[in-house]
Amino acid sequence: MNKKYKGIGVLAFAAGSLLPGATANAADQNAAGPSDGAAKKPNIILIVSDDTGYGDLGVYGGGEGRGMPTPNLDRMADEGMTFFDCYGQPSSTPGRAAMQTGRIPNRSGMTTVAFQGQGGGLPKEEWTLASVLKTGGYKTFFTGKWHLGEADYALPNAQGYDEMKYVGLYHLNAYTYADPTWFPDMDPQLREMFTRVTRGALSGKAGEAPKEEFKINGQYVNTPVVDGKEGVVGIPFFDRYVEKASLDYLEANAKSSEPFFMSINFMKNHQPNMPDPDYVGKSMSKSKYADSMVEMDARVGHIMDKLRELGIDKNTLVVWTTDNGAWQDVYPDAGYTPFRGTKGTDREGGSRVPAIAWWPGKIKEHSRNHDIVGGLDLMATFASVAGIKLPTKDRAGQPIIFYSYDISPVLFGTGKDPRTSWFYFTENELTPGAARVGHYKAVFNLRGDNGAKTGGLAVDSNLGWKGPESYVATVPQIFDLWQDPQERYDIFMNNYTEHTWTLVTFNEAITKLMKTYVEYPPRKPQSEAYSGPITLSQYQRFSNIREQLQKEGFQLAMPTGN
């Protein structure tokens, strides 16, 4: 074991032992899929939108009720399974890393959003959905938002994807930084830096250097080629290219003897929401967010229609979901969540996301599911459906652990959900900021609870990344998510209904989780930003711990912020 990280694992276990909480290691996922062994393996398509709210779709109580009809996703839900207790992560990069790797983001180091020019990204040692499925004979394709780094080794075509087309590397608003019409007060030297380091839409096959197809900016412009050279495509038009790449790939591979896996990632509905001109004013509410929601729904519908048209729908598993909870900090250019908290918090509003699974003839129509599932479970589930065993070593030959459960028994009605818990992490948390076991939730990280008044008699706004860091002093808040999904009533100590006894369960689960960090240490963070000062006394205490560990042969870097 690498001594540099072994020390971190020991400290993690110690911290986990001190916190009241709980967890379990992921189950062994070796089951074969539901299809006949002699039949062609199913195609698998993962469609991910960005920042879509839990309450935006009609099937979740939104749709026309929110002034933004979603007939295509609602049809997908009516023909498949809708999940009501599905979890992403509190922000885009960890949410996408969790889906792609099947690992808690702090294990891969993909814990927070990076800015352009920072380099790095998803470690080359990690397995992805694509690299695992390729071991089972799948062709693999990626298009749209990646957000897992900009170094060549971290790009989709170096992470198991045979081909990538029109890949966006950053959060959507990053493409406005260099635009003087957006930020006329920006220092010219800083603007020049953003112009220089921001990579545009990338395409390329595995083993090839990526090609920049066009630049991306925050204007209503669609000139991908100018005088035979790369041009510029504005944010409003980007998802046109993602849809086109998807439809072209389906056309080209519909009759292939090999199964395929597609990862399709729309930029909608991340702020700034700038709808394609074809969809401006097409929602009932006429807002930019609602128009963008109608656009995203239509593009998903076009992909689903193509599957039916090509006659491959009966042998294709499609999963649609989003990366994280609604970003209430940027209201009104944001999705809606009925839950407490927002993107960037350990509250339900930060991580609970909409999700739909569809496979005609395999998944029962109009299924409604309330089991604990999440984006982490895609890895084990897709591997199971494809008849593949998950690897026990990473791509560099070192032992690896997944936190992914095979939920195919849930999809196909053949068994119960193997997952009984969920752990919530924000940014660089090594131990969970919150934990759910069954229908009870313990909250240790109170970020987002001190929102500023929005005016009049309005409720407090939810401050996610903008809010102060705050942890409970000794005991967590306890919520019953069946009776109180909005986390309004702390039942830890409240007269005869007190639930202090739940600490035993949470302690057991979190301690079990943290023990795995000793055997499988986390990778170093792949992106870090200054998050505030540390005090001299904190620095001195850490220095003393560091010196003691050095005597035992362990190395720890000094901290730079809280």
Protein language model regions, located:
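Formylglycine-dependent sulfatase
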Residues: 3-18, 22-472, 476, 485-508, ...
